Curated annotation (Swiss-Prot):
This is Probable chromosome-partitioning protein ParB. Gene3D superfamilies: 1.10.10.2830, 3.90.1530.30. One of its GO terms (molecular function) is DNA binding. NCBIfam families: parB_part (TIGR00180). One of its GO terms (cellular component) is chromosome. Involved in chromosome partition. Localize to both poles of the predivisional cell following completion of DNA replication. Binds to the DNA origin of replication. Keywords: Chromosome partition, DNA-binding. Belongs to the ParB family. One of its GO terms (biological process) is chromosome segregation. It comes from Neisseria meningitidis serogroup A / serotype 4A (strain DSM 15465 / Z2491). Transmembrane segments: none annotated. The gene is parB.
Amino acid sequence: MAKVKGGLGRGLDSLLANGADNSSGDRLTTVAVKDIRPGRYQARVQIDDEALQELADSIKAQGVIQPVIVREHGLSRYELIAGERRWRAAQIAGLTEIPAVIKTISDETALAMGLIENLQRENLNPIEEAQGLKRLADEFGLTHETIAQAVGKSRSAISNSLRLLSLPEPVQEMLYQRRLEMGHARALLTLPVVEQLELAQKAVKNGWSVREVERRSQAALQNKRPEPKKTAAADIGRLNDLLTEKLGVNAEIKTANHKKGKIILHFDTPETFDHILKQLGIDYRP
């Protein structure tokens, strides 16, 4: 990657505007698919094969609606700046040419445009997104606020995303593979590093929800086991009262270890027995 010179600390608008040698010289044309090489400045690393095939099918039916963005790279060759999924899907669809906007821009502007184009899409995995945001912050000295405005997210969302890169590498890999969600990761970040991996592995193995991981993270911070969820069997006395009130007869619930048990309904006259059957919705006529 070319070293960025003179770009640090500049606002994003200034970066994109000043990075073009001649923005008015942009050309919309068609370019041979084989003459385009992947961009050096892409946030995306992983592309879902199934989603790519769906896009290829759409391109077969409707063509490429939105041009890719490229810049010249050698004689009759082009480097991709934005639109990698469209370019790859076009190859799968068997297209020989693709609509493209040819720009004359610097390395740093190519990086910014490529990152922002990908970050504005929602199908990056959380780690790819965090890595792209970090490059914008590190290589251009942009604040979280400036990055947030550029990609259409809140400043806190940018900060939370960047924090993912402090997780242990195995946990980052789980996020990369989408075995964990962003919500799981936020809960893990509250724990010491040693405990993050252990809880992440258990979450993946057991298929825990975000809420469950949050609960266990909070319990770990309090240095105690998670409190068991309340069940109906945990409040037998209250249930006795409710059942008695509902049926209008003396009800008794007996359990063994709050797992198995029986319900006893007491009656002392035939009329009371008939009343119980009626309350239970049983229409019995001997």
